[in-house]
A protein has these predicted regions:
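Active-site helical microenvironments for divalent-metal-assisted chemistry
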Residues: 2-181
Length: 181
């Protein structure tokens, strides 16, 4: 009885440690001029604030999904989005590895199911955080963030043309950007 309980407790601690370590992954490692010290933990917190602000009715599972959405990068790394876009077979394999890792620590889709609409809200919040991060870099004089910000805006406009929350946020960001140019 004691051994079984200790094994379960150790597994929980390993899962906890894996989840926490995921927050330490540095973002934009292939574009160091964009990092500005941002790691997965900072990005995730900001994305969760965006999600909760724009979609205040977001379910607990939706918020949990957002909280853990990049944790698997501790196991597989942060592959650049452009690589995923240009090599769908690599993206497919990476997604499978990420899902396996997430499920192994109790945070994958099997444990935290979300609806299609919630997945869209999480994706939009994730990309809006990217756009805001780049906007902040630009306002600090880092013009090298402009291309990434513009790609993020284009992605959001094309993928979510009828999503009111996304369009309102983009209008605000674009207005601020053009005012500060």
């Amino acid at each position: 009885m004691g051994t079984k309980r200790k094994t379960h407790k150790n597994a929980n601690l390993k899962h906890l440690y894996a989840k926490i370590r995921g927050g330490h992954v540095t973002r934009y490692h292939t574009r160091p001029e964009l990092t500005n010290g941002q790691n997965v933990a900072a990005h995730t917190w900001r994305a969760m604030v965006i999600l909760h602000t724009l979609w205040p009715e977001a379910s607990k599972n939706c918020l949990l999904h957002m909280m853990y959405h990049d944790v698997a990068e501790i196991a597989v790394g942060d592959l650049p989005a452009t690589t995923k876009w240009n090599y769908s077979e690599v993206h497919s394999i990476l997604k499978r590895i990420e899902n396996d890792f997430e499920n192994s620590i109790g945070i994958g889709e099997l444990f935290i199911p979300i609806t299609v609409e919630e997945a869209k809200a999480c994706d939009a919040a994730d990309k809006l955080e990217l756009v805001l991060h780049c906007y902040e870099l630009i306002t600090q004089g880092n013009k090298s963030a402009t291309d990434v910000m513009n790609r993020g805006i284009k992605y959001l406009k094309e993928k979510y043309p009828h999503e009111k929350q996304v369009n309102r946020a983009l209008k605000m960001i674009i207005r601020l950007y053009t005012m500060n140019k």
